[in-house]
């Protein structure tokens, strides 16, 4: 069965203090607002919608409720004990049941889809189905199928998609790995996509393989020399470390950030020949945030 995974749906950046996370991403030019609470899960989040995907900043709202729902491991608390950062990449499906069945036929250990939800500050219940990988495939990706239409979800937040930094969509997400060739084979099996060619990433200074998911790309990257990928691995080990956003104006994004106290982002030239700029993790809750687009 052909994969019906459609795109990167969102990234999950986890923070110890949600208000501080909102403030940080507001300084970067995102219109980000409290998204509500995950009922019975002890967590809450803030959301910045783009055209069809979004940014989620999440924190623990009630420690005891979280531990009761997550079990004794308390994975999010363990993650946050090493600092804020990008924890999961969430991939969207149009038919999660079919994708789960297809993954299992490929030998992937994955859960049955389960229903989840979030109550917005206005009391509106948003719903989705989610599937997670098992311990034989401990990758930092989750799978989602939204049950609430995009227009209804966007309507819950003011100025949805109208960001001062001009961001229109997620372009690419980067995951640091110790062995890019081995990781590319594993992600190929999980995603149901061919193994991509390995290339040297000019900005992240890593050997990388890019999986195209609709208009978005999921990249596994092995550090090759000092740079963002190597720094991220030295700081907290392998895992997601960077999000690249496509903006309508690089200069407009830079001006907003300068006006809000963010130092000028480093600039570089991507493999595509495009100019990109990169905000370091100390200004983005432990995550590299990149921008690419016209001046």
What role is predicted for each listed range?
Residues 1-8, 13-32, 50-197, 203-295:
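Glyoxalase I/VOC metalloenzyme domain signal
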């Amino acid at each position: 069965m052909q994969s019906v995974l459609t795109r990167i749906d969102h990234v999950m950046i986890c923070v110890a203090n949600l208000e501080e996370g909102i403030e940080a991403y507001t300084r970067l030019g995102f219109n980000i607002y409290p998204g509500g609470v995950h009922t019975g899960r002890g967590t809450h989040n803030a959301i910045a919608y783009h055209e069809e995907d979004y940014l989620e900043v999440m924190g623990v709202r009630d420690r005891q409720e979280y531990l009761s729902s997550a079990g004794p491991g308390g994975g999010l608390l363990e993650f946050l004990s090493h600092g804020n950062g990008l924890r999961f990449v969430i991939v969207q499906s149009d038919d999660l049941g079919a994708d789960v069945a297809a993954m299992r036929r490929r030998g992937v250990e994955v859960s049955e889809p389960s229903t989840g939800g979030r109550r917005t500050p206005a009391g509106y219940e948003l719903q989705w189905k989610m599937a997670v990988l098992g311990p034989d495939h401990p990758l930092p990706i989750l799978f989602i199928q939204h049950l609430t239409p995009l227009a209804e979800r966007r309507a819950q937040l003011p100025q949805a998609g109208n960001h001062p930094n001009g961001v229109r969509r997620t372009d690419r997400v980067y995951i640091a790995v110790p062995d890019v060739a081995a990781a590319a084979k594993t992600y190929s099996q999980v995603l149901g996509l061919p193994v991509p060619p390995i290339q040297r990433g000019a900005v992240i200074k890593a050997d990388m393989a890019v999986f195209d998911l609709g208009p978005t790309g999921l990249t596994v990257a092995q550090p090759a020399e000092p740079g963002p990928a190597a720094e991220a691995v030295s700081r907290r080990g392998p895992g997601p470390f960077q999000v690249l956003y496509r903006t309508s104006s690089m200069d407009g994004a830079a001006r907003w950030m300068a006006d809000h106290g963010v130092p000028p982002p480093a600039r570089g030239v991507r493999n595509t020949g495009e100019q990109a700029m990169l905000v370091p993790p100390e200004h983005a809750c432990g995550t590299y945030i990149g921008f690419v687009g016209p001046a």
